[in-house]
């Protein structure tokens, strides 16, 4: 029979491993979730970056999804409602020509403005993402 401390350590390790597996499976790519498939066009996808052309009509909702560290350039003005995994919501406004940095994030978004939102999003991958941490 194993010593209780070894059993506890094994259980702890299994729990942590399960958490990471679940976290990875819950983090969905924006191009695969409801609303994202129709609104996100991949322009470039290589080992370093993925560049997305995003167009969201008024009222468009994008289901919960994740991004690695990224930069967003707003081609048009934008008014979003952002929902985090814990259910908290906030509104964000951006103006055409504005660029924003974001660390890795999981959220759902909705265009709550009156105009189509057009933005270009550059997601960092590989060494670029590691350097951003």
Where are these regions (language model features)?
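Histidine-centered metal-chelating micro-motifs
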Residues: 59-62, 96-110
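Glycine- and acidic-residue-biased ligand/ion/polar-headgroup-sensing regions
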Residues: 67-86
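A short glycine-rich, His/Asp/Glu-containing loop-to-beta-strand
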Residues: 36-61, 68-72, 121-122
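Short acidic-glycine-tyrosine-enriched beta hairpin
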Residues: 45, 86-104
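Ligand-binding loop in jelly-roll beta-barrel domains
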Residues: 77, 104-127
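Boundary at the C-terminal end of the N-terminal hydrophobic targeting segment
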Residues: 25-27
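N-terminal secretory signal peptides that target proteins for export/translocation
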Residues: 1-5
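Bacterial N-terminal signal peptides
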Residues: 10-23
């Amino acid at each position: 029979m194993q010593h209780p401390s070894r059993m506890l350590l094994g259980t702890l390790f299994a729990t942590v491993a399960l958490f990471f597996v679940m976290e990875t499976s819950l983090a969905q790519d924006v191009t695969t979730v409801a609303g994202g498939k129709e609104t996100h066009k991949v322009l470039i996808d290589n080992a370093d970056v993925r560049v997305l052309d995003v167009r969201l009509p008024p009222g468009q909702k994008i289901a919960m999804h994740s991004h690695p560290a990224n930069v967003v350039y707003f081609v048009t003005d934008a008014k979003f409602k952002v929902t985090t995994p814990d259910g908290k919501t906030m509104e964000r406004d951006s103006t055409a020509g504005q660029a924003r940095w974001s660390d890795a994030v999981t959220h759902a978004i909705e265009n709550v403005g009156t105009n189509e939102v057009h933005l270009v999003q550059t997601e960092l991958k590989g060494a670029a993402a590691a350097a951003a941490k």
